[in-house]
């Protein structure tokens, strides 16, 4: 008996050690790049080990030079997209996130900012989606867009094999209106009038060269072609055109996009699920609505994501996977339609071969 106890403790220690090492090794981290034919986009894949192909999420980042992890030289180092990808992988959901054209390691794909447009970003999402749909390691594709990425994903979705779309902190109103609201409380009256004049010109499709130094970072001439393309779009209208299941997630302490935006998206597509999260800010952390803690969250990559966000997103994706699995035996048991019968209705979340 005296020798069995140390052996038992040793066996327990070895078991715990093996479990500690098993969790990270159960998720593959791999580069995942896309050659678009006019530039290579660099990305990262998180793939949980699974006996069956898991669903895969394509994460579409927000505005400006936001990289694949969610970091932005103007918006902070907080890695919100990386943290979301990790949380989804722990729940059996694969993901690909990427540096946008002209950003970080995809800079060479668009070295000139003047060459960027919403249409270019939409085409890139379509190309990524087509590659993921061809990859046999994945069962189904879900687009997840954050902030401006929700608009880009909404515009791209009808051209992709995506079966669901999730909009996180996505605007529900035209972006020029959003910029005006954001500037209204931050600029003195004279500068605000100048900004309104420039925004009106861009909305009309006209570039401006007379940008005051105080506004140069936001409205510099090199970014104006992109803003002109962005101001043409209506996020709610684009979202309302979608014919796939959709989830809207919005934090109540978001100082950049408000609950009214999420409600506008739901009005545009009433069958969408809407989840409002108390305390969550724009970068998906729990933070006060004002003060230093709200701002400091933008530069703290170690803050955990809002738990309700991860639960809502993963539940929506996994329920879609279960619905697809449940529909398969039913479709297989149906008799083949005769020429006089109508084509079987496509089950929610299920792709039929004719639709590809």
Give the label of every model feature segment.
Residues 80, 113-134:
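Alpha/beta-hydrolase active-site loop
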Residues 242, 248-250:
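Short beta-strand/loop motif that positions the catalytic acidic residue
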Residues 130-187:
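Primarily recognizes the serine-hydrolase "nucleophile elbow" in alpha/beta-hydrolase
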Residues 283, 289-334:
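Catalytic active-site module of serine/aspartate enzymes centered on a nucleophile-bearing elbow/loop
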Residues 166-237:
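Accessory cap/linker subdomain of secreted extracellular hydrolases
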Residues 23-52:
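N-terminal cap/lid segment of alpha/beta-hydrolase-fold proteins
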Residues 51-53, 57-88:
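Short, surface-exposed "cap/lid" segments of acyl-processing enzymes
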Residues 80-107:
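Conserved alpha/beta-hydrolase
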């Amino acid at each position: 008996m005296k020798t069995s106890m140390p052996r038992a403790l040793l066996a327990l220690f070895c078991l715990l050690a093996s479990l500690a090492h098993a969790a990270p090794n159960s998720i593959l981290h791999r580069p995942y790049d896309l050659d678009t034919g006019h530039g290579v986009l660099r990305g990262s894949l998180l793939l949980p080990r699974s006996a069956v192909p898991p669903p895969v999420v394509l994460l579409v980042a927000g505005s400006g030079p936001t990289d694949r992890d969610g970091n932005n030289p103007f918006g902070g180092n907080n890695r919100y997209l990386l943290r979301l990808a990790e949380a989804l992988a722990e729940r059996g959901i694969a993901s690909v996130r990427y540096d946008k054209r002209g950003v970080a390691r995809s800079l060479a794909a668009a070295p000139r900012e003047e060459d960027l447009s919403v249409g270019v970003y939409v085409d890139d999402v379509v190309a990524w989606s087509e590659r993921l749909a061809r990859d046999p390691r994945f069962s189904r594709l879900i687009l997840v867009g954050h902030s401006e990425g929700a608009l880009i994903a909404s515009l791209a979705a009808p051209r992709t094999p995506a079966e669901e779309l999730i909009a996180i902190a996505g605007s529900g109103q035209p972006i020029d209106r959003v910029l005006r609201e954001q500037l209204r409380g931050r600029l003195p009256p004279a500068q605000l009038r100048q900004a309104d004049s420039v925004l009106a010109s861009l909305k009309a499709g006209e570039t401006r060269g007379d940008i005051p130094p105080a506004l140069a970072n936001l409205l510099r001439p090199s970014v104006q072609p992109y803003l002109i393309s962005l101001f043409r779009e209506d996020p709610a209208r684009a979202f309302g055109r979608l014919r796939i299941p959709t989830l809207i997630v919005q934090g109540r302490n978001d100082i950049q996009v408000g609950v009214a935006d999420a409600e506008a998206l739901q009005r545009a597509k009433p069958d969408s699920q809407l989840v409002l999260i108390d305390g969550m800010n724009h970068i998906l952390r729990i933070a006060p609505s004002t003060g230093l803690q709200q701002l400091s969250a933008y530069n703290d990559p170690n803050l955990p994501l809002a738990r309700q966000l991860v639960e809502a997103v993963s539940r929506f994706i996994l329920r879609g996977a279960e619905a697809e699995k449940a529909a398969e035996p039913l479709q297989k048991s149906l008799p083949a339609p005769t020429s006089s019968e109508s084509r079987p209705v496509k089950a929610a979340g299920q792709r039929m071969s004719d639709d590809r």
